[in-house]
Regions:
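Short, conserved charged micro-motifs
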Residues: 30, 91-94
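Short, glycine-anchored, charge-dense loop/turn motifs used at functional sites
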Residues: 124-129
Length: 136
């Protein structure tokens, strides 16, 4: 972390500020509606593009005609994650999302040996979102 703290104008080195996930989707409108269930607000930009926001998290959607969901990651030796989102209350978020009929919890809330408690959600396009919180 020391390198990140040392970056900035005084060092002559650009500092990276954040990262935004970009998901390809087959049909943007139902995908935007699905993310609204998760508490994201959406802004529709030019046709085929949207920005989703919830708190400090931002996800871009880009429509690609003929896009097909990735193969079921459950068939791979290790499940593929598309985005890893850290929250301050993973249990409350899990309860919130579990109560939604249109949301598929693809991995139940569970502690991990690397010090995080996590659960996964699969979106309409096969993208796996992991929600996590450090264990205390």
């Amino acid at each position: 972390m020391a390198n990140a703290e040392q970056a900035g104008p005084a060092t002559g080195r650009a500092r990276l500020r954040n990262s935004t996930t970009v998901f390809l989707v087959g049909n943007i409108e139902p995908t935007m509606e699905w993310y609204k269930q998760l508490g994201f607000e959406s802004e529709y930009y030019p046709p085929g593009f949207a920005i989703l926001r919830r708190d400090d998290i931002e996800i871009f959607l880009q429509q690609q005609p003929g896009y097909a969901a990735p193969e079921d990651p459950g068939r791979r030796k290790r499940e593929a994650w598309n985005v890893y989102i850290v929250t301050d209350d993973v249990k409350a978020l899990y309860a919130e999302y579990s109560a939604l009929s249109g949301v598929k919890i693809s991995r139940q809330l569970c502690p991990q040996d690397y010090g995080m408690t996590e659960f996964d959600v699969m979106d309409l396009n096969g993208h796996r979102l992991v929600f996590a919180q450090p264990m205390r």
